[in-house]
Amino acid sequence: MNFVEARNLPGHVGIIMDGNGRWAQLRGEPRVAGHREGALAVRRTVRAARRLGLRALTLYAFSEQNWARPEEEVDALMQLLREFLLSEKDEILDNGIRLNAVGNLGRLPALVRAVLDPLRYESEQNHQMTLTLALSYGGREEIVNAARELAKAVAAGRIRPEDVTAEALRAQIPSLSVGDPDLVIRTGGERRISNFLLYGLAYAELYFADVLWPDFAEKDLFGAIASFQARERRFGLVGSQSGNTCAPDAAAPVDSAPADASAPIARIAV
C-alpha cells in the first residue's frame, strides 16, 4: 500500500498532459473531443492539487511547436482555452489560486488574451497555490530568451561577464518563478520530456503514466506523488550525504480522505 503525506509533498509539480488525440481516436471521435475531455481532467487535477496542498502546479497546455498542427485544430484549442478560463474563473478566484502563464504569449489570439490577462491580474494576490499554464511554450526557447537578456545587460554595461552565472540565468526564466520542479508527470505512455521546463529539470523526479490525459484522475495524481515520496533525492550526492529521502514514516495508514473533501490531506492511502 502506498501513501501520500502532506509533510513530504513536492513543492512544484509539472505535468505534460499527453494523450488527448489518442483518447478521441480510440473512440472514433474528432481530436477536439479529446481536448475537451482533457479540459475536464485539468479541472479535476487542479482541485486535487489544491486539496493536497501543493504550492505550485505547471501544466504544459500548448507548445510552441503545436502551432504547426492543422489550423482547424489550433483554432479549436484556442476557443477551448478561452472557454476553460471563463468557466474556471470563479473557482480560481474563490480558492486562493494565482493564475500564471509562461511562453510566447504574444502569439496567443486576442480572444484568449482578453480572458487570460485580466484573470492573471485579478488573481495575482492569491497565495494558496500557483497554477501556471505553459502556452506557446518551449523550454529551449525560454533558455535562449534568458541568455539573450543577459547578453543585452552585458552589452549595455549593466552587468559584467563574470556576473553571468547559473543563478543569474535562472532568474530570467519565467517558468521557474515558483521554483524548480520537484516532480514532472507525463501521461499517455510516452517516455520523453518534449521541451518542457528544461532548465529547471536538473534534479526533478520523473514519473511516466500510461493513462491518457482525459482519463487522468485524482488517484493518478496521488499515485505519482506517492512514488515521489518513496524516492531518495540525492542532488548529485551519495545517500549518506544527502539525508534527503521522501519516503514516508511508518505511521498507521489512513484508508480514506477527510470528510471535508476541500481540506488539505494529512495522509491518505492510494
Q: What does each model-identified segment do?
A:
Residues M1-V270:
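Flexible, compositionally biased loop and terminal segments
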